[in-house]
Amino acid sequence: MKVSASVKKICRNCKVIRRKGVVRVICTDPRHKQRQG
């Protein structure tokens, strides 16, 4: 899980979603998991 100020899609499987006001990236590759904050 990377915590960064700006979350970006890394590959085509990445999806940017909003969960409880937190922007997250979910992906089939666990290394691509990110959250904003």
From Swiss-Prot:
InterPro entries named in the record: Ribosomal_bL36, Ribosomal_bL36_sp
The entry's keywords: Ribonucleoprotein, Ribosomal protein
Domain of life: Bacteria
Single Gene Ontology MF annotation: structural constituent of ribosome
One of the GO BP terms on file: translation
Gene Ontology CC entries for this record: cytoplasm; ribonucleoprotein complex; ribosome
UniProt-listed PANTHER family: 50S RIBOSOMAL PROTEIN L36, CHLOROPLASTIC, LARGE RIBOSOMAL SUBUNIT PROTEIN BL36C
Entry's family note: Belongs to the bacterial ribosomal protein bL36 family.
NCBIfam families documented for this protein: rpmJ_bact
Protein name per its UniProtKB record: Large ribosomal subunit protein bL36
GN (gene name): rpmJ
